[in-house]
Regions:
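Non-catalytic interaction/Regulatory regions outside core domains
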Residues: 1-145
Length: 145
């Protein structure tokens, strides 16, 4: 069941976004929620840790808390890559739980270089991980913020 609570955030306050941004963020989040097994999705600024928009989630999945926590996961991985002198970029990070997949997809398309990521939570019993990764890549390619 999709929670229709769609929120946009800027710093700690909810904001009204320009029409073009709103349509693109809203469309991307709604498309992500059509992925089989989707429980919740956020578009997150990993510089600040704040979510720009959430869809889904619920009582047991606070997407704002998850956004901040997953920002730390990304920062830790980037520090590790720097320590190892890896000249590469993170495409996505998968966290596998007993009942869920948590997929963190850093946005890399040329129109979107603001340090954003999509965070998607999937029910393991209903999700096809390979297909979900493919669909999230497609959503990323079309997203303009």
């Amino acid at each position: 069941m999709i929670n229709a609570d769609l929120r946009y955030r800027d710093d700690a306050k909810t904001r009204t976004v320009g029409r073009a941004d709103s349509v693109n963020i809203e469309t991307a989040l709604k498309e992500a929620m059509t992925i089989d097994g989707a429980v919740g999705v956020s578009l997150v600024d990993w510089d600040s840790g704040m979510s720009l928009g959430n869809l889904g989630g619920g009582k047991y999945l606070d997407l704002d808390v998850a956004a901040a926590g997953n920002t730390e996961v990304i920062r830790a991985k980037m520090r590790t890559m720097e320590s190892l002198r890896l000249d590469d970029n993170i495409e996505d990070i998968l966290i596998t739980l007993n009942k869920q997949y948590h997929l963190i997809r850093l946005l890399k398309n040329s129109r979107n270089e603001q340090g954003l990521f999509l965070y998607l939570v999937l029910d393991r019993q209903k999700a096809n991980l390979a297909l979900a990764r493919h669909q999230l890549r497609s959503i990323e390619a079309e997203l303009v913020v």
